[in-house]
């Protein structure tokens, strides 16, 4: 069995790490490189960096910090933000990123997933999905351009359909960003994760809602996700990664202990 992964998420805007609640009202957390170094030293299995306004601004992720991060950490990291071409992806990978993640650009042009997978291999192509639960309809819908509140829009895709579509097109991994839970710290949306797990045959990463160590355990045990991504509990030092992994190990979760 592959070890489950603990993945701190660093949302980047204007060269700094920020964090919001339900993708709104972002506050500055700190500088990118020191935070990345701290999480690597604490025992993170991987890091994810989202340049949250790149797609909505019509630009690609600012690459200046990517190579600096690669110099100071020795764990894999994934970069996302406005990657719309093979050239964009190639540059970011050449600066030291291990994976690239696409979200809004994949919705705009789904063939991008296949072209990236064919060029660089499925193992380094992640598709992020920003999913919102509509209580009125009881359905999960995919959102686009979520880094900018004024430009966010609901797409025609229902989440389960898009999960299946991106796999057909070559996604090597899926990060499910559950917008209703984001930053609230009330736990991952286990119902949604279980439904997605049934149709997701590539590694599935849960994102949005972690507030306690038990929330991570539930995601691994009850929804069988491959990784759990979180931000605010790590940024605000509510949970220490090393202590979290030790706890999960005592609960029988296959995890890499640092």
Curated annotation (Swiss-Prot):
Its EC number is 4.3.2.10. It is found in: Cytoplasm. One of its GO terms (molecular function) is imidazoleglycerol-phosphate synthase activity. The active site is at residues 11, 130. GO terms for cellular component: cytoplasm. InterPro entries: Aldolase_TIM, His_biosynth, HisF, IGPS_HisA/HisF, RibuloseP-bd_barrel. Gene3D superfamilies: Aldolase class I. One of its GO terms (biological process) is L-histidine biosynthetic process. Its main location: cytoplasm. It catalyses: 5-[(5-phospho-1-deoxy-D-ribulos-1-ylimino)methylamino]-1-(5-phospho-beta-D-ribosyl)imidazole-4-carboxamide + L-glutamine = D-erythro-1-(imidazol-4-yl)glycerol 3-phosphate + 5-amino-1-(5-phospho-beta-D-ribosyl)imidazole-4-carboxamide + L-glutamate + H(+). SUPFAM superfamilies: Ribulose-phoshate binding barrel. IGPS catalyzes the conversion of PRFAR and glutamine to IGP, AICAR and glutamate. The HisF subunit catalyzes the cyclization activity that produces IGP and AICAR from PRFAR using the ammonia provided by the HisH subunit. NCBIfam families: hisF. Belongs to the HisA/HisF family. Heterodimer of HisH and HisF. This is Imidazole glycerol phosphate synthase subunit HisF. It comes from Escherichia coli O81 (strain ED1a).
């Amino acid at each position: 069995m592959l070890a489950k992964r603990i993945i701190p998420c660093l949302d980047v805007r204007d060269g700094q790490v920020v964090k919001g609640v339900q993708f709104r009202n972002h506050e500055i957390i700190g500088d990118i490189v020191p935070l990345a170094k701290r999480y690597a030293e604490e025992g993170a299995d991987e890091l994810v960096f989202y340049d949250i306004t790149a797609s909505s601004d019509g630009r690609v992720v600012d690459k200046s910090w990517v190579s600096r991060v690669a110099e100071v950490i020795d764990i894999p990291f994934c970069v996302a933000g406005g990657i719309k071409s093979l050239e964009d992806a190639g540059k970011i990978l050449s600066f030291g990123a291990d994976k690239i993640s696409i979200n809004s650009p994949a919705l705009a042009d789904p063939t991008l997933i296949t072209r990236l997978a064919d060029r660089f291999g499925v193992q380094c192509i992640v598709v992020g999905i920003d999913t919102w639960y509509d209580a009125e309809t009881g359905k999960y819908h995919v959102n686009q351009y979520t880094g900018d509140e004024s430009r966010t829009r609901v797409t025609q895709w229902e989440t389960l359909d898009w999960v299946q579509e991106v796999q057909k097109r070559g996604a090597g991994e899926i990060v499910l960003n559950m917008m209703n839970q984001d930053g609230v710290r009330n736990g991952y949306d286990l119902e949604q994760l279980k439904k997605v797990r049934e149709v997701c045959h590539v590694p599935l990463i849960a994102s949005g809602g972690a507030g306690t160590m038990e929330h991570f355990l539930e995601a691994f045990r009850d929804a069988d996700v491959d990784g759990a991504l979180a931000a605010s509990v790590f940024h605000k030092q509510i949970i220490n990664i090393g202590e979290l992994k030790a706890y999960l190990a005592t609960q029988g979760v296959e995890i890499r202990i640092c």
